Amino acid sequence: MSNHKLIEAVTKSQLRTDLPTFRPGDTVRVHVRIVEGTRERIQVFEGVVIKRHGGGISETFTVRKISSGVGVERTFPLHTPKIEKIEVKRRGKVRRAKLYYLRNLRGKAARIKEIR
């Protein structure tokens, strides 16, 4: 077996199949497992997906939310076991793959139309 086939087989076994399909513009709730010392808890991060990057085992997505008037962005690896689950709250209608322009918009201007 060649190296490429071996790497492909190993990464294919590591991919998660239990995650929903979502795209940039969707509002999602990401349930992340946080380890603090010996304790473990679930933290929920809810916001708009502004980008998806990469493919395969190294695919990531970035979620943006406004917390206390400050924009917070967090990038998650898609296939990490630290993600407990992802809930899609709203489907957004956008015409771009990367929604970086949302960083400059405030309030109602930063809203995204919902797909019916």
Swiss-Prot record:
Belongs to the bacterial ribosomal protein bL19 family. It comes from the Bacteria. The keyword Ribosomal protein applies. It comes from Staphylococcus carnosus (strain TM300). GO terms for cellular component: cytosolic large ribosomal subunit. One of its GO terms (molecular function) is structural constituent of ribosome. One of its GO terms (biological process) is translation. Keywords: Ribonucleoprotein, Ribosomal protein. This protein is located at the 30S-50S ribosomal subunit interface and may play a role in the structure and function of the aminoacyl-tRNA binding site. Pfam families: Ribosomal_L19 (PF01245). This is Large ribosomal subunit protein bL19.
